[in-house]
Amino acid sequence: MTDDLLEEYAPEIPEGYVRMNWFQGFGRQIGPLYERVNADKSYTRAFLVGEPHTNGMKNCHGGMLMAFADMALGHAITLHANRYWVTVRMVTDFVDAAAIGDWVEGSGKIAGCDDDIYTVTGRIWSAERTIMTATGIFKALGVRPPKRQV
């Protein structure tokens, strides 16, 4: 990756979203990422498509969308079971493109669970446009420690 990722990137974000505190490793490379807890206790994760996220056509790269879908869908397990998880399989359908400046959102819902294997379905969208649909198979691992209050 390039040093331009170190530059401060502070887009204007929609109301209710907070920046996720993933400042190291992979999250740093693809972020910044945002999260909102909705009134019904569901969640939405999001990012603003910037130049580092794009392909040669200046649209959001499919790999970025797949990585984001992984984090958006897998978070359903974190909320449901308070456990770490790994992705076993992810099936995605690309429906539309996201351009630089698009606010991309995503969420997932648990469709089923057998032992420690979860099936989660989800959608990635921008405004009213569906960008991607996905179904993920995830394996739940150990219990997550409580979040530290800062």
Question: Which stretches of residues belong to each language-model region?
Answer:
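Terminal targeting signals and extreme-terminal segments of soluble enzymes
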Residues: 1-150
